[in-house]
Structure formats: C-alpha cells, structure tokens
C-alpha cells in the first residue's frame, strides 16, 4: 500500500526563541577510561571530573544493560609496501569502523524513570564491563582500536535539560579470532514465523498516520536543507557547505521514499516490541544490522501524532529518527552522538552529519502539523 496526500498540512514551526547549546566549558565533564579485561571483554570507568554533581541518562551509554553501542571499533591503520626494492613506495590503509550489530534506542526527553538515570558526585566513578564481540563480528581477529566520545544528556528531575561531553582514551588490542567467534551475538534475527506478524487495530492506524506525516516532514526538510535558510541549516549542521546540504537533503529524500510504502523498501517495521528491548523510557528501537525498526508501547501512549512544540518528540519524528538510523535507507546509517537540541547543536559539522537526532530536530524545528485549511506562514527565518 502506497500513501498519497495528507489530510492535514505541514506548516513551518515557530522556533523564534532558540535555546543555546550548553556551555560545556562550565559544565561537568565525564572521562572514560577503557581497558582490556580478557580478549574482547572491555571495562569502562566513567568518572565525573567536574566540580559539581551530575545526573545523566545512561540509556545508549555505559551502564545500559541492553546491547547498545558504547564504543566505536576500528581496524588499525597500516602501511603496505608496494615494491620490495623501493621502500618509500607504500600504500596507507586507513582505519575502517566495524559495523555495529546491536540495538539503538530512542528514549523520551521528559518523564524519565529513576532507573534510567545515574548520579555522580565530583570525583566519583562507575564501572561497566561489556563484550564487544557480542555486538560486532570480530571473528577475523587481529588489531582493533577502541574509543568513544560525544555528549550524554543530563537531567533535572525527570527531564533532559542539557548535556555533558565525554571522551575516552584510545585502546588498541589484539583479538584472538577463535575466542571472539565463540562469543554469542547479543541480537539474532527473528525466525520466519515471527517476521510475518503484522500491525492491526489502533496501532496500525497510528503507524499509518506516522508514516504519512514522515513522508511530508522528510520531503519538506529535504527542500529546506537543499535550498532553504542558510542560517537555519547552520544552526543544526554547523556549516552552509553546498555539498553537505546536498547530502542532508538526499538522506531526507531517502527517508521519505522509505516511509511512502508498507509493501516494499529496505526496512522491516514492527508495531510492537519483537525483541524485548522496550521499556517505559523507550518509544522505539532499531537494529541497524538487520534494518529492523520496532515501536514500543509508549510510542502510542506517550507521543502525539505530530507535536506543536519546537524540538519536542512525537510519533512522526520518532519514525523519521529510526529511518535515519537505518543504513538500508541511506548509507551509512547515523549514530547517537548527541541527544536532544542542546547536545546536537554542540556537535561539530562532521558529527552533526552523522547524528540521528540532528535530522529529527531539524525536521521538527522547521515544520508543524496544522488542521487549518488556510496555510499560515509562522516565521520567515
């Protein structure tokens, strides 16, 4: 089934008063120390190096029990001689990031439960051990470089109110191929009987509406990225480069194309939690290795179809968020480098281009669903 026109109009959303990125020089900072425990078993020590208490959201971060991406893995850079008699003639093989085979979660920005939060006093630290072979194929063995950096959301009460930067050392390890191959994958594809499950009832209706809204949001965001306000694009992507604008627009168009049909495309979209990774804080999960998306219960109970609030979450931008993650929609898929407006707008241009929430925020910050017949322009930025 292909979707056509929306019953409602998508209009520019007024975000006239822009929140400023966090002044990360004045905020606490998290230092991550990575070490090898045994072959692919890694330990992370996360320390608050600032001078004040910090409460951060540990979903998609260290302490999360789900198989989320905590570090990036790279095959090490090396040099290949091209001629035995001319050592100066070499070919340099640059590091390549290994594909992540775990899950990525979108979590709510308000109403977070206590079990999603970690509090660290100045100088205090937490430890987390995890096996990188459970979420990446390391059966080839060899030299691997491990590191992580980005921004983690901080919370006041149960609401995300800012972000703090974190970074780690660069850890190089030698992986034993046989041991790595013996580690069970954290996520396995569903069997065929489960994959044929389909949406029905109110959830089917809600997802159909979300997909229609996603098509309109993504198409209009593509136009705005390609030829809209340069200052607005700069706000989110930290550049006005024509090549970057073209790339962003292409990803939005790919999302619109993917959302336009429920009978074809690169992703499989489930109305319910097929893997058991949902929680009261998570409206949706994505499995990038399999291009699978699944909605959680609070997608339907907590999120509106399309918000009227700038940079707030809703069903449409959550669906857009998940499609933006998927490498099958547009390769490479995006990562979770900065969550929420504060963190996303603190990223560099290259990071923003690879940050899933930057796309959702740009689409949400630019447009608004209105049931009015007359289209009114709300702002001219």
UniProtKB/Swiss-Prot annotation:
Propeptide: 20-193
Keywords: Cleavage on pair of basic residues, Disulfide bond, Hydrolase, Metal-binding, Metalloprotease, Protease, Signal, Zinc, Zymogen
Ubl conjugation keyword on record: no
Cofactor(s) this protein cannot do without: Zn(2+)
Pfam families linked to this entry: Peptidase_M35 (PF02102)
Binding positions (Zn(2+)): 321, 325, 336
EC number: 3.4.24.39
Listed GO MF terms: metal ion binding; metalloendopeptidase activity
Protein name: Neutral protease 2 homolog mep20
Species per Swiss-Prot/TrEMBL record: Aspergillus flavus
Gene: mep20
